[in-house]
Amino acid sequence: MDSRLPRLVFALLAIYAAIHFSSSYAQMPEVVASHFNAHGVPNGWQTKTAFFGVFVAMTVLSVVIGFGLSAIIGAVPIQLINLPNKQYWLSPEHRGATLEFLKSYFAWFSCSIYLVMIVFFDYAVQSNLHPESPPVASHLWYTLAAFLTFVFAWLIRMFARFGRPPRQNVGS
């Protein structure tokens, strides 16, 4: 698995977010609704500087999770790694392919987290820019359902990949 594509996707998402949110910054009130209940009604506020600061901090966190974690895994002693059948998957002959898979896999996970963040932050931005006709909160639930479906499929794929070592061809 090649990790260049998810890196490119993440970079494009970051560029989009930077352009999109920076164009909205000046139009936002100084104090913005930043937290909403399940029905989309605001119930928490903060300054717009703090609001966008949280977005930047969460962007950095998603980079660390998606791109830093796989680098850390490669440097950590094998006994500290929690991976099914790790003796096989992290043996010298399989370690490189395993780490490359994890690097790409966590990069895609980071992209999904970041996309969800963008959708949720955009909901808050649009709610502040158009308080008389805020966006429909159900879109957030659909986004959350799609993300949870992705995570479920992501975990299944992870366990399918590492759940057991491939069978050796006996007698060939």
Q: Model-predicted segments: where are they?
A:
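Alpha-helical transmembrane segments and their membrane-interface junctions
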Residues: 19, 108-129
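Alpha-helical transmembrane segments and their helix-start/interface "positive-inside/aromatic belt" motifs
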Residues: 1-14, 55, 100-107
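Active-site and channel-lining beta-strand-loop segments
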Residues: 22-53
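Juxtamembrane inter-helical linkers in multi-pass membrane proteins
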Residues: 76-97, 168-172
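Alpha-helical transmembrane segments and their immediate juxtamembrane interface regions
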Residues: 52, 99, 123, 127-172
